Amino acid sequence: MAHIGLNEDEARKQNLDVIIKKLPVMAIPRAKTLGETDGLLKAVIDKNTGEIVGCMLFAPDASEVINIVAMAMKTGQDYTFLRDFIFTHPSMSEALNDLFAL
């Protein structure tokens, strides 16, 4: 499990207009090859700016994948950076393409 930034409730309490994206781990090819398909990836995105304001990962290798999201957030990238980034296949990080596909 890994988390960065705001969760959905925290974002709404700050009056942010957010888009919530979810991806079940069973949809990730690498999770299938690992035989670990339980879990969920969830992203909180500011609808007006495209900024990633939070991300929660309940998945294999979450402690590694969250670092990629953190880097995107800290360098001011919007969600399209991770949506369009080319990741190796199969990898847990490639799930970020699907998570951030709006």
Predicted features and spans:
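Flexible, glycine-rich terminal cap/loop adjacent to redox cofactors
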Residues: 1-7, 12-102
